[in-house]
């Protein structure tokens, strides 16, 4: 039997947002319809929560005093529960915007609102397309640059091992950009 050659995997650079793009996105989310999309955008950006996970979250799962967000197994991509840390920039975004526990984090018709926020922040289909999961990749890259721990990042992201993080999630970020990300 002839052996089949394995194709060589060529990884592409991981797209992440630059500090200026983050500032524009957060400002746009804060200004859009009274900031109703800002908590969800903040959780994707500063906690690495997947878009479909944040769409399922309720405020009851957010504990600002313990600085954690509980992702239930039925809401996660991998089917496992996890506690995600609420880092200081996210605390600032959430502390004055909390809603009753039974309310969802995302407003009704979330996909349409999220598309509008991105468009108003400058991401257009052809001229400046939005990269899927760019906020999750941005979080992973800045987290690793700041905390320097694949193990900690793996827990935050809900990954079984760090191999996927190393090859598909993390882009190298240098000090000044990392400092700007975490000092908002």
Tell what function each PLM region has.
Residues 16, 75-76, 150, 157-182:
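Catalytic-site neighborhood detector that most strongly recognizes the C-terminal catalytic loop/helix
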Residues 75, 87-127, 139:
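Active-site/catalytic core of tyrosine-dependent DNA strand-transfer enzymes
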Residues 57, 97, 113, 117, ...:
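Residues in the recognition helix of alpha-helical DNA-binding motifs
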Residues 6, 27, 56, 64, ...:
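Phosphate-coordinating loops and pocket residues in cytosolic domains that bind phosphorylated ligands
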Residues 2-51, 55, 77, 136:
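Basic, Lys/Arg- and aromatic-enriched nucleic-acid-binding interface segment
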Residues 42, 46, 52-53, 134-160, ...:
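C-terminal catalytic core of tyrosine-transesterase DNA break-rejoin enzymes
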Residues 7-11, 25-33, 51-52, 65-91, ...:
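Basic, Lys/Arg-rich DNA-contacting stretches centered on the C-terminal catalytic core
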Residues 24, 56, 92-93, 152, ...:
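Short, solvent-exposed alpha-helical surface patches in well-structured domains
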